[in-house]
Regions:
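Walker B catalytic acidic pair
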Residues: 202-204
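Short N-terminal micro-motifs specific to bacterial/archaeal maturation
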Residues: 165, 172, 207, 231-232
Length: 301
């Protein structure tokens, strides 16, 4: 009887919790996992603010110490952002699978692995053919670099199987550049990349040969044009940035692109500034190290 009373009491107390409190707790848990319990600028005393603007909807979140407060409960996001920042995530794929993290609260790397494998297990040949037919231009360019697919053996090992062969290679033994294309292709084929969805790419060009950088830039632009995918991209490469500009113009997407540059506001804060009307500012900043090197060379001569 005591246990039943405790159970009923727990239900009664749970029903008293507001939807707002539940939402704020969920947001706090997710953000704390992603940012390792450091949501605020450790060098500033100001409370933190997060603002998200999607079409005509706005979400405002205030962060004070570990307390989260969101301004609304009905923010209409129906697609999931896919964050790709490290192709080496495939090297630890078996370890992360065995950790079995909670599906509700995963960091972006665990989330990516789940999308790569668990979604892939439920992808039929018909599903892949539909994607191939619908996005022939994108798929054809992917095939030029990455003609195989990622498979999971009965032993649990994750491997890459090239086209027209029964043999496979451990994903750990793939070149780092190829891993980047394998990840993108797998997410496209298994339906993880949705129409009007979002992909966040953090310096994707780092491990790519210059020729592959061009192909990757073209793929990103085509995904946005053919699939309606929103792409948030960070790069420190003027070469890769120029490739994005050129292919955006080629596929008539230049007016859809926005360019931003980060700069220090003071010793403790940085600002992100829209320079879409003057992209040369970015190239000037990225070219400064090369100018330093040229000055050194001149001094040697």
């Amino acid at each position: 009887q005591l246990r039943m009373d405790d159970f009923v009491g727990h239900i009664v107390e749970s029903l008293k919790i507001s939807d707002e409190a539940i939402l704020n707790s969920l947001i706090a848990r997710k953000l704390n996992i992603e940012f390792n319990n450091q949501l605020l600028n450790v060098f500033a005393e100001d409370r933190g603010k997060i603002e998200l603007h999607v079409q005509n909807e706005n979400l405002h979140i205030e962060v004070e110490q570990e307390r989260i407060c969101a301004n609304r409960l009905d923010f209409g996001l129906h697609t999931e952002a896919i964050y790709i920042d490290d192709p080496f995530v495939l090297d630890n794929i078996d370890i992360r699978l065995n950790r079995r993290p909670s599906r509700r609260f995963m960091d972006h790397r665990d989330q990516l692995i789940r999308k790569l494998l668990y979604e892939n297990e439920h992808t039929s040949v018909v599903d892949e053919i539909v994607v191939e037919n619908r996005f022939q231009k994108i798929y054809g360019k992917l095939q030029n670099v990455c003609n195989g697919r990622m498979i999971r053996q009965k032993s649990g090992e994750v491997e890459y199987q090239p086209k027209n062969t029964e043999k496979s290679i451990s994903v750990k033994n793939l070149s780092t550049g190829l891993k980047t294309f394998v990840i993108l292709k797998t997410l496209l084929l298994n339906g993880t990349i949705e129409e009007n969805g979002m992909i966040i790419l953090d310096e994707p060009e780092i491990h790519l040969h210059p020729a592959w950088q061009l192909q990757f830039a073209e793929l990103i632009v085509l995904l946005s044009k053919e699939f309606g995918v929103n792409v948030l991209l960070n790069t420190h490469s003027p070469y890769f940035l120029r490739a994005i500009q050129v292919y955006s113009a080629k596929y008539e997407m230049a007016d859809k692109c926005k360019y931003y540059m980060s700069e220090l506001v003071d010793d403790k804060k940085a600002g992100i500034f829209d320079v879409s009307d003057d992209v040369d500012k970015i190239f000037e900043k990225l070219a400064q190290p090369l100018q330093v090197l040229e000055n050194e060379r001149c001094n040697i001569d």
